[in-house]
Design a protein with these regions (language model features):
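Conserved alpha-helical "signature site"
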Residues: 39-139
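Post-HExxH zinc-binding segment in Zn-dependent metallohydrolases
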Residues: 2-51, 105
């Protein structure tokens, strides 16, 4: 937001369509580059994706029991709770699916960097990787 406010156009602070995946992934990528993205955090990101997927098809109890195969009780509970948050009846299938963007975004930003993408351009504001080619026409 702050970097976006420094740009000529407000859209850089309000956000381009679908910017959030890149923004969250870029934050995780920066943690990774600084050596702060531990295997435990990555496992949590993956667990959130799994919990989201399971929640779309199952009840709270079924999701929790499935996650116990991969996570300790407290972690399985927290992952299930996050995936089912906001639902009025957690016994039914459904999920708050925003949490999948952290892992997906991280992997996309990492791939972008590994393929020679200009990481510095992602600091410009709330943009997605797919918007980087458009910057030459805007800035």
């Amino acid at each position: 937001y702050e970097n976006g406010k420094k740009q000529k156009y407000a859209m850089f602070s309000f956000g381009f369509p679908n910017y959030l995946e890149t923004e969250e992934g870029f934050a995780a990528y920066n943690e990774y580059k600084c050596g702060l993205l531990s295997p435990k955090i990555l496992k949590t990101y993956a667990g959130r994706v799994l919990a989201n997927d399971l929640s779309l098809k199952n009840s709270f109890c079924a999701v929790y029991n499935s996650l116990l195969e991969y996570f300790p009780k407290n972690d399985a509970w927290t992952l299930t709770l996050r995936a089912k948050r906001g639902l009025s009846d957690t016994s039914k299938p459904g999920a708050f699916t925003k949490d999948h963007i952290y892992l997906k975004g991280f992997l996309n930003v990492k791939k972008y960097a590994e393929r020679g993408g200009d990481i510095k351009k992602l600091y410009i504001g709330k943009i997605g990787i797919e918007h980087v080619p458009l910057l030459k026409y805007i800035i």
